[in-house]
């Protein structure tokens, strides 16, 4: 099994706003995603996972860690990853940079609206 890894710079170099908006619009024509969120806590730290399954397209799990203490260490407070899985057999197909997805999906939704 070969898993594609898409880091921020590599992914951003391949994206453009018009194509992204077209893709989001096409996605809205697919069956509605089943979505579930989970939160885990340790003191002030948080792990958030959002899972989505679009029948006929696939599954995505976006996990984010929020470590407020990182600020004092000059480390990013929010980190994460997006894992994409096959709709056919559930195998991992890609690992995508969290910040790439957050930036482009959030802005793309706003542009499309």
Language-model features, listed with the residues they occupy:
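N-terminal ligand-binding/catalytic initiation module
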Residues: 1-103, 111
């Amino acid at each position: 099994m070969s898993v594609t890894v898409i880091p921020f710079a590599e992914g951003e170099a391949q994206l453009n706003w018009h194509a992204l908006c077209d893709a989001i619009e096409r996605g809205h024509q697919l069956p509605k995603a089943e979505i579930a969120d989970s939160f885990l806590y340790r003191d002030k730290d948080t792990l958030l996972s959002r899972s989505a399954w679009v029948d006929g397209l696939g599954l995505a799990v976006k996990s984010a860690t929020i470590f407020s203490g990182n600020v004092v260490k000059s480390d990013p407070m929010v980190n994460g990853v997006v894992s994409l899985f096959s709709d056919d057999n559930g195998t991992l197909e890609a690992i995508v940079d969290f910040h790439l997805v957050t930036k482009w999906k959030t802005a793309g939704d706003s542009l499309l609206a």
